[in-house]
Design a protein with these regions (language model features):
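Acyl-donor (CoA/ACP) binding surface of acyl/acetyltransferases
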Residues: 1-24, 28-31, 63, 69-188
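A short helix-loop-beta-strand connector motif used in the catalytic cores of GNAT acetyltransferases and
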Residues: 53-65
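Conserved GNAT-fold acetyl-CoA-binding loop/helix
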Residues: 33-52
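A generic secondary-structure signal
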Residues: 51-54, 111
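Short helix-loop boundary/capping segments at the starts of domains
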Residues: 31-34, 57
Length: 188
């Protein structure tokens, strides 16, 4: 689906992915280090463009590109499988600094909680992916099981984030982002 507005933060903003983003997002998806724990893709830039066109039509599926304040695409974020009161968060690739990547995650979660009005968000991370697992704990997600995704060799930790836990943890993280932004200015 396409969300018609930009979602603006202090260091980044999100906008719905468009077919013209195919080349840059294809390159991101082909970066072996960044997608080590994700489903591997095959195909071409044209295949990525077709995927984006189909994704835009898919009910309850939002895919965003992350932009810095110079309009550079520095990542991707997804909110998908939106149901009555829940959604999933993932499809995350980040090339920004730690503050930009964290704020991009928060903006996606804000979108799910505040715009889509879900009460909980499901997410997962490879057990070996300590950085993502650490971030999930920082935002208040709670593990509920471990298991495997079809076609991926790594064990995964499956977590759920409630609106209540997120609101408590979000304030602390935003204070850090604000302090960074005030100290170093906007990332240009």
């Amino acid at each position: 689906m396409v969300y018609p507005k930009e979602i603006k933060g202090l260091t980044v903003r999100l906008r719905s992915i468009m077919p013209e983003d195919a080349e840059i997002t294809y390159k991101m998806r082909m970066d072996r280090e960044k997608v080590k724990y994700m489903h591997q893709i095959k195909g071409t830039v044209e295949d990525q463009k077709n995927y984006i066109i189909q994704q835009q039509k898919k009910e309850g599926d939002y895919l965003f590109v992350v932009l810095d304040h110079n309009d550079n695409v520095i990542g991707m974020r997804g909110i998908y499988n939106v149901k009555e009161n829940s959604a999933e968060s993932g499809r995350t690739i980040g090339y920004g600094d730690a503050f930009q990547n964290m704020e991009a995650l928060l903006l996606g979660l804000d979108f799910a909680f505040d715009i889509l009005k879900v009460d909980k968000i499901y997410m997962d991370a490879a057990t070996d992916n300590q950085s993502v697992r650490g971030i999930q704990m920082q935002i208040g997600a709670q593990e509920y099981k471990r298991g495997f995704h079809e076609g991926i060799e790594y064990e995964y930790v499956f977590s759920v984030l409630s609106r209540e836990n997120y609101q408590i943890c979000r304030e602390k993280i935003m204070r850090l982002i604000e302090r960074h932004t005030n100290r170093f200015g906007r990332k240009e």
